[in-house]
């Protein structure tokens, strides 16, 4: 097995070599990965990719509003800030634009992406 370490950038793992590896959106969504989380990728002898979160960064939580941009991407909006969300997370929660959502962000790192933690029922 080949083992590669890196960090999550919101969509993919960036290895210490600088190479990017696609992280399955369902894994990132289910694991609530945030920008900066350390990941380990094991590539099996038959090409199977297995990701594992090895060192999560400190997190903070916010309540935001869900918006959908004209290009189809989803964003969490809080005051004058916005963070992109994985479509897999929005689909899983069956969230709709205008819904109030709970998001998770890295506490001490700038981020363009947020993890969708939950849908807040009105």
Question: What are these model-derived regions, one by one?
Answer:
Residues 42:
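Short metal-binding segments enriched for Cys and/or His
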Residues 120-122:
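Short acidic DE-rich linear segments
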Residues 1-33, 38, 48-106, 114, ...:
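S1/OB-fold single-stranded RNA-binding interface
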